[in-house]
Curated annotation (Swiss-Prot):
Gene name for this UniProt entry: int
Core-binding (CB) domain span: 74-155
Keywords of this entry: DNA integration, DNA recombination, DNA-binding, Hydrolase, Transferase, Viral genome excision, Viral genome integration, Virus entry into host cell
Role, per record: Integrase is necessary for integration of the phage into the host genome by site-specific recombination. In conjunction with excisionase, integrase is also necessary for excision of the prophage from the host genome.
EC code: 2.7.7.-, 3.1.-.-
Gene Ontology terms, MF aspect: DNA binding; hydrolase activity; integrase activity; transferase activity
UniProt cross-references to InterPro entries, sorted A to Z: CB, DNA-bd_dom_sf, DNA_brk_join_enz, Integrase-like_cat_sf, Integrase_catalytic, Integrase_lambda-typ_DNA-bd_N, Integrase_recombinase_N, Integrase_SAM-like_N
Similarity annotation: Belongs to the 'phage' integrase family.
Any GO BP: DNA integration
Subunit structure of this chain's protein: Homotetramer. Interacts (via N-terminus) with the excisionase (via C-terminus). Part of the excision complex made of the integrase tetramer, IHF, Fis and Xis.
Protein name: Integrase
Length: 356
């Protein structure tokens, strides 16, 4: 039978002890470490009870007064429901919206459904660091950006006053994909001789227009009007009109000549078409490019370049040939002045690119 506690110790909560000199100590049951609480019995008992609740509950304890005051607070998950509607109202592309939803799903998994004001920077950092520790710094960066935007919207609607995401570190995601040089392009182009004829033409069009592979596959002959190729970029919604008089001197590519070859050889409704004159998917184009790259015998440091790197090559060549401003304009990257113009036009006007 265990030893009976003395009268002084009898009514003390678990883990609270009183020394012979009347000094109270709390012993952490997990480590055995003791913490002094002074000689005031009432304060010592209150502190010990609170510590026991927090240690044994398995989660952060919230005082009753705080719970009463937060009954009308918006929780994180309910706010994310609202945030999804805000995103839908922005008129963004379906693919971009799907990307947002995947990040929101990750946030729901990684953070508790607590009131927004109770989500701490420490909790957010722990979630993001989990991705970084798994080598997913790029994912951490995108999730952080989405969560920060959600918090900014919550501030705008008056639910919180502070964006706790802002205090976290932005993950540094290293781009491991190798850049493609003009000489390497020519070697891959040569290796593509045994590929379907449309691959070389797609490579030429990608470099001379600077557009993404998905937009290349969507280009139609009806998009060419009065010497301009009209492109609405699927990723950003940017509308640009590219002059067909463009040419890349370093590679000897003329946009007009490439278009003429596409018309004569492919003859489909889309500018880039299969041997059956049918539209091609971006996956098919990228896959055949990868085969030609392997056939070229080239080796690269880091991840080998994909078809998308032709866009970067285009920008670098035009930067040398014309100007950095022209290259960024062609890619659809908006300067502050251009962004202002887009807002004024409300997306109704096409941005004509001029060769200067």
């Amino acid at each position: 039978m265990g030893r009976r506690r003395s009268h002084e110790r009898r009514d003390l909560p678990p883990n609270l002890y009183i020394r012979n000199n009347g000094y109270y100590c709390y012993r952490d049951p997990r480590t055995g470490k003791e913490f002094g609480l002074g000689r005031d019995r009432r304060i010592a008992i209150t502190e010990a009870i609170q510590a026991n609740i927090e240690l044994f509950s398995g989660h952060k304890h919230k005082p009753l007064t705080a719970r009463i005051n937060s009954d009308n607070s918006v929780t994180l998950h309910s706010w994310l429901d609202r945030y999804e509607k805000i995103l839908a109202s922005r008129g963004i592309k379906q693919k971009t919206l799907i990307n947002y939803m995947s990040k929101i799903k990750a946030i729901r998994r990684g953070l508790p459904d607590a009131p927004l004001e109770d989500i701490t920077t420490k909790e957010i950092a722990a979630m993001l660091n989990g991705y970084i520790d798994e080598g997913k710094a790029a994912s951490a960066k995108l999730i952080r950006s989405t969560l920060s935007d959600a918090f900014r919207e919550a501030i705008a609607e008056g639910h919180i006053t502070t964006n706790h995401v802002a205090a976290t570190r932005a993950a540094k995601s290293e781009v491991r994909r190798s850049r493609l040089t003009a000489d390497e392009y020519l070697k891959i182009y040569q290796a593509a001789e045994s590929s379907p004829c449309w691959l070389r033409l797609a490579m030429e069009l990608a470099v001379v227009t600077g557009q993404r592979v998905g937009d290349l596959c969507e280009m139609k002959w009806s998009d060419i009007v009065d010497g301009y190729l009209y492109v609405e970029q699927s990723k950003t919604g940017v509308k640009i009109a590219i002059p067909t008089a463009l040419h890349i001197d370093a590679l000897g590519i003329s946009m007009k000549e490439t278009l003429d070859k596409c018309k004569e050889i492919l003859g489909g409704e889309t500018i880039i078409a299969s041997t059956r004159r049918e539209p091609l998917s971006s996956g098919t184009v990228s896959r055949y490019f990868m085969r030609a790259r392997k056939a070229s015998g080239l080796s690269f440091e880091g991840d080998p370049p994909t078809f998308h790197e032709l866009r970067s090559l285009s920008a670098r060549l035009y930067e040398k040939q014309i100007s950095d401003k022209f290259a960024q304009h062609l890619l659809g990257h908006k300067s502050d002045t251009m962004a202002s113009q887009y807002r004024d036009d409300r997306g109704r006007e096409w941005d004509k690119i001029e060769i200067k």
